[in-house]
């Protein structure tokens, strides 16, 4: 059932939870689509002028229970996860803290220049890997593993599910040849080796850049964490491997090594760490995490025909290529390694790098006093948003010489619920057009934000939309601040 098809009764459940918690009626409801990739959960932002929360609708009770219990447990340990405001498990609904809309992946994509990673993104990653041991060790010590779903531990059964997922939904559907029995023998050897590592810690399971939110606190990006409902007891190596070999993040190897070292330094404060023993198992867990991800890409992309999932495959193959050339595991897995070599050499899989025609989205800020920006492409498609109804920083003396790109103005506008809702609505409308334009092969879309002077609100809105769009595949974003450019000429 899609967002649009949500039964009125279920939406009313979320509204009731909001009103009971905040003692205020809901004024706006904003479905958030695509936030959780392949998940079946429905995510809705409910808000008033000053209040906001995220409502979740999901019909797998065991997974809901795991998320709710883990969230409360982690908060008791002082970890940065959303507060749970209210729940109604009989309807598969709960209400949680709104952590905003900026993920670690969006920051990485927005600040990126070619292969290099911006200092702001590196700093955020360092904070993330420093917090991870607190989840794994500190909070993992007294966690109630009985509520884990679908397994209490990353055990033989869990590993078998992941390996078979990879075999049947990726290798088979991608047409990679292999000897079934020989591959099963390698799977058995790999499983035995993985299970010989210490597995007495919390394994987050989906510890990757799209599940980490960033919020500005004292003008610095601070990480908050989501999507740990699949967590269970397991080895330390799995989660750091998930983060550093997150396919679309495409982190350079030298940065991966720096972050791994920083993680191990942080981990040493919580456990008696034998680094050589940790590294003995590390790359085996990297391989198994990559296989799990490829199985997911194959299931969503090859089987369900959701082709955008396949755009991550070339990045995963790049990781495999590096591993094949630089890492030798302590165990022999000849058939599996041959399958990997066939994958990285496959013309079919290499062809997945040919993405649809790129769409260029031109985002303008402007002053209504000077008229609308002109569409120089001749396409004529897009939006003009009027931001004059929003709170105006230009009326305050402290902001008069600043623009919507300056931190004090950004912080001021970020705190305005009306601005957040306006921006969420604009993103939703533009996202729908971007999807349609790409599907139909259009090359240009224009989005303009206007305000009184073209200095504060319109500049801020244009920058925020551009940051959001840069995280999308096959979209080039060009930002123009018309009035500011004319002032600087």
Predicted regions and their residues:
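Active-site activation/catalytic loop segments of kinase-like enzymes and analogous catalytic loops
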Residues: 164-173, 236-272, 287-303, 316-323
């Amino acid at each position: 059932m899609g967002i649009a098809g949500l039964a009125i009764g279920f939406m009313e459940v979320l509204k009731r939870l909001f009103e009971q918690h905040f003692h205020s009626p809901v004024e706006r409801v904003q479905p958030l689509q695509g936030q959780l990739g392949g998940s079946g959960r429905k995510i809705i932002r409910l808000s008033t002028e000053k209040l906001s929360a995220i409502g979740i609708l999901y019909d797998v009770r065991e997974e809901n229970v795991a998320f709710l219990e883990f969230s409360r447990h982690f908060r008791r340990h002082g970890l940065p996860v959303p507060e749970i405001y209210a729940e109604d498990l009989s309807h598969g609904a709960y209400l949680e803290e709104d952590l905003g809309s900026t993920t670690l992946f969006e920051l990485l994509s927005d600040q990126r220049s070619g292969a290099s990673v911006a200092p702001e993104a590196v700093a955020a990653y360092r904070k993330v890997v420093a917090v991870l041991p607190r989840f794994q060790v500190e909070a993992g010590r007294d966690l109630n593993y009985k509520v884990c779903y679908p397994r209490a531990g990353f055990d033989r059964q869990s590993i078998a599910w992941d390996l078979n997922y990879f075999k049947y939904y990726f290798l088979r559907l991608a047409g990679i040849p292999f000897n079934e029995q020989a591959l099963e023998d390698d799977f058995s050897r790999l499983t035995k080796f993985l299970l010989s590592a210490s597995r007495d810690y919390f394994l987050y399971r989906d510890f990757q850049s799209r599940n980490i939110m960033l919020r500005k606190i004292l003008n610095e990006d601070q990480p908050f964490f989501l999507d740990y409902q699949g967590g269970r007891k397991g080895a330390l190596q799995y989660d750091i491997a998930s983060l550093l070999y997150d396919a679309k993040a495409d982190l350079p190897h030298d940065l991966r090594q720096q972050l791994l070292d920083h993680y191990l330094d942080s981990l040493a404060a919580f456990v008696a760490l034998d680094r050589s023993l940790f590294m003995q198992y590390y790359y085996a867990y990297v391989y198994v995490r990559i296989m799990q991800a490829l199985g997911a890409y194959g299931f969503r992309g090859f089987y369900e025909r959701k082709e955008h999932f396949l755009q991550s495959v070339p990045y995963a193959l790049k990781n495999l290529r590096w591993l094949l050339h630089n890492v030798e595991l302590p165990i022999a897995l000849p058939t599996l390694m041959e399958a990997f070599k066939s994958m990285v050499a496959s013309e079919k899989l290499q062809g997945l790098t040919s993405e649809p025609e790129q769409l260029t989205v031109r985002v303008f800020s402007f002053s209504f006093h000077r008229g609308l920006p002109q569409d120089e492409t001749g396409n004529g498609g897009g939006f003009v948003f009027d931001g004059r109804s929003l709170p105006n920083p230009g009326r305050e003396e402290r902001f008069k010489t600043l623009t919507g790109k300056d931190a004090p103005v950004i912080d001021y506008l970020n705190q305005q619920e009306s601005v957040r809702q306006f921006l969420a609505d604009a993103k939703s409308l533009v996202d729908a057009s971007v999807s349609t334009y790409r599907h139909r092969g259009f090359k240009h879309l224009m989005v303009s934000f206007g305000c009184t002077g073209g200095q504060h609100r319109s500049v801020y809105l244009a920058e925020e939309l551009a940051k959001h769009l840069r995280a999308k595949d096959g979209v080039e974003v060009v930002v123009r601040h018309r009035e500011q450019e004319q002032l600087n000429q």
